[in-house]
């Protein structure tokens, strides 16, 4: 809509001769909406092959889903006042649903052109993975996972 407002900021969080990772955050204020929708997406490019790199290249969806459902889950930059509500919400989502979301994470878009529900990137050995949550909980949370410690 012409009256909607989209704001997106890009931060290059990692770059070297082989790989570039950009994180995009922002919001969409739709006409008539009480609160804006918060946005998060990432893109990691293999600069040698000029191809997208995603969760399937440095982690696996089933492991990440099990981690999100575990008591060990760690969130990146989640306000303390939201932690309890997010944890309660995650308890209502089954592991198969999370696995499916994480299997479709990252670019490129799926065959049907659908925008992924989850985005990820790897930085200094830590995997960061977004997970959709209800609008009242902030639209998404970021899970941080360090494979060596799991």
Per-range role (PLM):
Residues 1-150:
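Compositionally biased intrinsically disordered regions enriched in Thr/Gly
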């Amino acid at each position: 809509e012409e009256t909607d407002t989209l704001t997106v900021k890009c931060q290059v969080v990692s770059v070297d001769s082989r790989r570039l990772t950009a994180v995009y955050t922002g919001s969409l204020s739709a006409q008539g909406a009480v609160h804006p929708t918060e946005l998060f997406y990432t893109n990691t490019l293999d600069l040698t092959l000029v191809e997208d790199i995603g969760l399937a290249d440095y982690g696996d969806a089933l492991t990440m889903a099990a981690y999100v459902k575990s008591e060990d889950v760690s969130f990146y930059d989640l306000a303390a006042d939201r932690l309890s509500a997010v944890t309660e919400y995650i308890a209502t989502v089954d592991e198969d649903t999370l696995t499916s979301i994480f299997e479709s994470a990252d670019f490129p878009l799926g065959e049907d052109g659908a925008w992924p529900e989850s985005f990820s990137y790897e930085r200094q050995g830590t995997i960061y993975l977004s997970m959709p949550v209800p609008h009242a909980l902030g639209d998404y949370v970021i899970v941080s996972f360090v494979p060596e410690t799991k």
